[in-house]
Amino acid sequence: MSLGTEEKQNLINTHQVHPTDTGSAEVQVAMLTTRISKLSTHLQGNIHDFSSRQGLLKMIGQRKRLLGYVRSKSEKRYTELIEKLAIRG
């Protein structure tokens, strides 16, 4: 489940740290979260799609590592990102 150009641009504009930012950890987490939610919806209807399930688990692991990085750099940025994306709790 890939993201379209417009959808990527909207995510970048929403989560960028500075005007020329396109690849910060916050932007990457936002893109992964969107892809994870799309793939989760796909897997609810296609239970036996095991390759997609494996890709989903890899994306979740990548997002977890990026969130750990953001948290190690700034607890404030981490909590703001979690609230903005409504990921935890």
Swiss-Prot record:
Annotated Gene Ontology cellular component terms: cytosolic small ribosomal subunit
Which PROSITE patterns does this chain map to?
RIBOSOMAL_S15
| GO biological process terms on file | translation
Q: Does the keyword Zinc-finger apply?
A: no
Q: Name one GO molecular function term.
A: rRNA binding
Which portions of the sequence form the region Disordered? Answer: 1-23
SMART domains from the UniProt entry: Ribosomal_S15
Which SUPFAM superfamilies does this entry report, sorted A to Z?
A: S15/NS1 RNA-binding domain
Q: Which UniProt keywords apply?
A: Ribonucleoprotein, Ribosomal protein, RNA-binding, rRNA-binding
The annotated regions of Polar residues compositional bias extend over: 10-23
Classification via Pfam families: Ribosomal_S15
What protein family is recorded? Belongs to the universal ribosomal protein uS15 family.
How does the record describe its quaternary structure? Part of the 30S ribosomal subunit. Forms a bridge to the 50S subunit in the 70S ribosome, contacting the 23S rRNA.
Q: What does this protein do?
A: One of the primary rRNA binding proteins, it binds directly to 16S rRNA where it helps nucleate assembly of the platform of the 30S subunit by binding and bridging several RNA helices of the 16S rRNA. Forms an intersubunit bridge (bridge B4) with the 23S rRNA of the 50S subunit in the ribosome.
* Name this protein carries in UniProt: Small ribosomal subunit protein uS15
**Organism this protein belongs to:** Prochlorococcus marinus (strain NATL2A)
Give the taxonomic lineage as stored in the record: Bacteria, Bacillati, Cyanobacteriota, Cyanophyceae, Synechococcales
